[in-house]
C-alpha cells in the first residue's frame, strides 16, 4: 500500500512540474553545439524576414513611383488635348460645328492661279455659243406664243361694263372666252350690252343716227338771227341712252351675285364639272313644278271635256 501511494505522489509531482523553471542546459544529454546552431538559424530566419520586408517595401515604393510617373504623363497628355471650339472634350455639337466650318471654308485655302489666254478664249466662245442658242430658242418660243395668243384672241370677247351698284359706279374691262360662263352670261344679258364689245351688239347705223340727232338738235336750237330757241327737244329713248353709254344701268343684288358667280366659275375652271354634275337649282326646280302643274291642268280639262261630251250624248 505504501508503494502505491509513493508512485501516485511521484505522478502528481510530475504533473505539477513548472515549465518556467526548466532549463535545457541542466539536462544530462544537453549538447551546446546544437544550441548554437539553433540560435544561428533563428537569427538567420529573422534577418531574412527583415530583408524580405525591406525588399517588399522598396518594391511597393518603386511601383508607386512608376504609377505616379505614368499618371503624370497621362495628365500631361490629357492637358494638351484642346479642341478648336475651346473645350477639353469634343462633343457631338462641336464635331458638327467643325464639319460645317470645314465645308464652309474649304475653298478659302485654294490658290487661284492666273488663267492662260487659251482658257479665256475658250470660255468666251462657250458664252457666245450659249447666248446665240438662247436667242434662237427665245425667238422660236416667242413665235409659238404669238400664234397661240392670236388663236386665243379669236375665241375671246372684250367685256366692258359700267353699272351702278350700292351707290357706286363700277367699271369693268376684261377679255373672257366666248364659251365661258361669264361670256355666255354677258351675251345673254341684253340689258348690260354697251356696244363696244361685239360688232353685232351695236350696229353702226344706230350710232350714226344718235350722233346726227344730237347735231341736228344743236343746230335747231339757233334761229336765223342767231338767237337760241327755247323749245325742248324730244327726249331720246332709254335703250338708246344705254347703248350710247350715257345711262348706267342699275344692278340688283341677285344680278350682281349671278355675275360674280359666273366670274368665279371661270376663274376656278369648274364650268365643265358643273355641267357634268349639275342637279339644277331653284329656278330649274320651279320650272319643273310649273310644267307638272300645267300638265295636270291640261289633263283635267281634257277629262272634263270628255265628261261633258258623254253627258250630251246621253241626253
From Swiss-Prot:
Biological process terms from the Gene Ontology for this record are:
chromatin organization
Which domain of life does the protein's organism represent? Answer: Eukaryota
Which residues fall in a coiled-coil region? 56-115
Give the primary localization class: nucleus
Domain BCNT-C: from-to ranges: 233-310
| Record key words, sorted | Activator, Chromatin regulator, Coiled coil, Nucleus, Transcription, Transcription regulation
Spell out the Basic and acidic residues composition-biased ranges: 31-49
Ranges of Acidic residues composition bias in the record: 9-30, 57-73
- What is its subcellular localisation? Nucleus
What InterPro entries does the annotation carry? Answer: BCNT-C, Swc5/CFDP1/2
The terms describing its cellular component in GO are: Swr1 complex
Q: Which PROSITE patterns match?
A: BCNT_C (PS51279)
The record's region (Disordered) falls at 1-84
The free-text function statement in the UniProt record for this protein reads: Component of the SWR1 complex which mediates the ATP-dependent exchange of histone H2A for the H2A variant HZT1 leading to transcriptional regulation of selected genes by chromatin remodeling. Involved in chromosome stability.
* Subunit relationships: Component of the SWR1 chromatin remodeling complex.
Family note: Belongs to the SWC5 family.
Protein name, entry field:
SWR1-complex protein 5
Q: What is the scientific name of the source organism?
A: Kluyveromyces lactis (strain ATCC 8585 / CBS 2359 / DSM 70799 / NBRC 1267 / NRRL Y-1140 / WM37) (Yeast)
Amino acid at each position: 500500500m505504501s508503494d502505491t501511494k509513493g508512485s501516485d505522489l511521484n505522478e502528481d509531482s510530475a504533473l505539477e512540474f513548472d515549465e518556467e523553471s526548466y532549463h535545457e542546459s541542466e539536462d544530462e544529454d544537453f549538447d551546446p553545439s546544437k544550441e548554437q546552431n539553433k540560435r544561428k538559424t533563428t537569427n538567420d530566419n529573422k534577418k531574412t524576414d527583415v530583408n524580405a520586408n525591406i525588399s517588399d517595401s522598396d518594391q511597393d515604393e518603386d511601383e508607386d513611383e512608376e504609377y505616379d510617373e505614368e499618371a503624370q504623363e497621362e495628365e500631361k497628355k490629357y492637358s494638351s488635348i484642346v479642341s478648336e471650339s475651346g473645350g477639353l472634350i469634343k462633343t457631338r455639337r462641336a464635331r458638327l460645328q467643325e464639319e460645317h466650318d470645314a465645308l464652309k471654308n474649304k475653298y478659302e485655302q485654294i490658290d487661284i492661279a492666273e488663267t492662260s489666254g487659251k482658257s479665256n478664249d475658250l470660255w468666251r466662245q462657250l458664252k457666245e455659243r450659249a447666248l446665240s442658242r438662247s436667242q434662237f430658242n427665245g425667238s422660236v418660243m416667242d413665235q409659238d406664243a404669238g400664234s397661240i395668243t392670236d388663236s386665243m384672241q379669236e375665241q375671246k370677247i372684250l367685256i366692258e361694263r359700267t353699272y351702278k351698284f350700292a351707290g357706286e359706279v363700277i367699271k369693268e374691262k376684261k377679255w373672257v372666252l366666248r364659251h365661258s360662263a361669264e361670256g355666255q352670261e354677258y351675251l345673254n344679258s341684253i340689258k348690260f350690252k354697251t356696244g363696244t364689245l361685239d360688232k353685232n351688239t351695236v350696229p353702226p347705223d344706230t350710232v350714226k343716227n344718235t350722233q346726227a340727232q344730237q347735231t341736228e338738235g344743236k343746230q335747231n336750237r339757233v334761229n336765223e338771227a342767231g338767237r337760241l330757241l327755247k323749245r325742248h327737244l324730244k327726249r331720246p329713248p332709254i335703250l338708246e341712252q344705254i347703248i350710247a353709254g350715257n345711262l348706267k344701268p342699275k344692278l340688283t343684288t341677285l344680278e350682281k351675285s349671278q355675275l360674280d358667280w359666273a366670274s368665279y366659275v371661270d376663274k376656278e375652271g369648274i364650268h365643265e364639272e358643273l355641267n357634268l354634275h349639275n342637279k339644277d337649282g331653284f329656278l330649274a326646280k320651279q320650272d319643273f313644278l310649273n310644267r307638272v302643274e300645267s300638265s295636270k291642268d291640261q289633263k283635267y280639262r281634257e277629262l272634263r271635256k270628255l265628261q261633258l261630251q258623254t253627258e250630251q250624248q246621253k241626253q
